[in-house]
């Protein structure tokens, strides 16, 4: 499956001049410290992955004989590919009728799963779990589909410590305790997704692994410029192509109709995207900034909007014409904050058609 770069000459110039971000295979940098908590120093030195519980994400089960066709008309990606050719995890957005993102989701195939569950597991932002369920029920109509929440399951992210770990699979010592273990479909720099029983400890399941806290996980996301959840992707506001959905393998342009498809397809075929969600470094802590604050150039020209962040890292929707400039915004205390955008290494470097 091919991909398409939809940005113009201005951003290509940034890629050449800046070289993009350095690949952040090593999480133990000056900006991202992995804390060992109760692990010993000896144990941490042999760990290949850091394991993060993701309480801000939740899991739903969608099952029944119409599951695939039901989701096919709702999500941006192609359900016909899930569960085929070893593709067992798929990223997608759910759009409104105007073509704006409502929810970002990851789907996990349960095909051949021996543990009683079937259909797919749907990962979404936990703060909008009820809204997602309500939306699915509205579109369900008379389809043979069952919907349920899964409070007995826990979702984990396994982030690699090295390039070798990125390319390798986590060593699972007790496979019967793992419901799902799949590469994060958005980018290899996000490691692996694992779903287990809420009662199980990942350290008893994965060898050469140590626990980290969720803030470290978010810091890594913002450092590499990967959006997740309603804070980064405000429902009804974010446009999927501006949010780099193509780069995260989250959309099919050949699957046919789905809700919100018209605007997305038209934008794709014109090839014009003037703004993109980009990682930014900040001169002040993100906690002092308001979501949606306007970005400006030093000359006062509109340059985009700030979204969210942690510490001095964050995401902003940046006008590509100004992406290589030093930008500014006002903090909640009316102080001027400097904003510098970067081009992630995991973005494609040459134009390709998906």
UniProtKB/Swiss-Prot annotation:
Repressor as UniProt keyword: no
Chief localization: mitochondrion
Subcellular location, record wording: Mitochondrion
GO biological process: heme biosynthetic process; iron-sulfur cluster assembly
Classification via PANTHER family: TRANSFERASE CAF17, MITOCHONDRIAL-RELATED
Protein family: Belongs to the GcvT family. CAF17/IBA57 subfamily.
UniProt-recorded Gene Ontology molecular function terms: transferase activity
Disulphide-bonded residues: none
Source organism phylogeny: Eukaryota, Metazoa, Chordata, Craniata, Vertebrata
Transmembrane segments: none
Native species: Danio rerio (Zebrafish)
UniProt entry keywords in alphabetical sequence: Heme biosynthesis, Mitochondrion, Transit peptide
Protein name: Iron-sulfur cluster assembly factor IBA57, mitochondrial
InterPro entries: TrmE/GcvT_dom1 (IPR027266), YgfZ/GcvT (IPR045179), YgfZ/GcvT_CS (IPR017703)
Transit peptide residues according to the UniProt entry: 1-50
């Amino acid at each position: 499956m091919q991909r398409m770069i939809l940005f113009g000459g201005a951003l290509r110039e940034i890629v050449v001049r800046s070289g993009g971000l350095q690949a952040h295979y090593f999480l133990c940098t000056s900006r991202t410290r992995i804390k060992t908590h109760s692990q010993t120093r000896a144990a941490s030195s042999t760990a290949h992955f850091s394991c993060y519980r993701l309480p801000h994400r939740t899991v739903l089960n969608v099952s029944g004989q119409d599951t695939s066709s039901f989701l096919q008309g709702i999500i941006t990606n192609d359900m016909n590919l899930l569960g085929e050719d070893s593709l067992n995890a798929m990223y997608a957005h759910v759009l409104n009728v105007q073509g704006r993102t409502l929810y970002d989701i990851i789907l996990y195939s349960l095909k051949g799963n021996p543990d009683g569950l079937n259909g797919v597991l749907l990962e979404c932002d936990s703060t909008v779990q009820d809204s997602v369920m309500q939306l699915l029920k509205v579109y369900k109509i008379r389809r043979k589909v069952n919907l349920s929440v899964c409070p007995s399951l826990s979702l984990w992210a396994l982030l690699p410590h090295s390039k070798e770990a990125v390319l390798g699979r986590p060593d699972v010592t007790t496979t019967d305790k793992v419901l799902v273990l799949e590469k994060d479909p958005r980018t290899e720099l996000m490691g692996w997704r694992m779903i287990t029983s809420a009662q199980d400890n990942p350290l008893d399941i994965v060898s050469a692994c140590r626990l980290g806290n969720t803030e470290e996980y978010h810091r890594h996301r913002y450092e590499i410029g990967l959006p997740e959840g309603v804070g980064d992707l405000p429902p009804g506001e974010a446009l999927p192509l501006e949010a780099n959905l193509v780069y995260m393998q989250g959309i099919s342009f050949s699957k046919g109709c789905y809700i919100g498809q018209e605007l997305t397809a038209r934008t794709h075929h014109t090839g014009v995207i003037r703004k993109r969600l980009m990682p930014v470094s900040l001169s002040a802590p993100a906690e002092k900034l308001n979501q949606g604050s306007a970005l400006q150039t030093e000359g006062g020209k509109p340059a985009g909007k700030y979204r969210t962040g942690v510490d001095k890292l964050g995401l902003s929707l940046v006008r590509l014409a100004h992406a290589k400039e030093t930008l500014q915004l006002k903090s909640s205390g009316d102080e001027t904050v400097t904003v510098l955008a970067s081009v992630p290494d995991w973005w494609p470097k040459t134009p390709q058609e998906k």
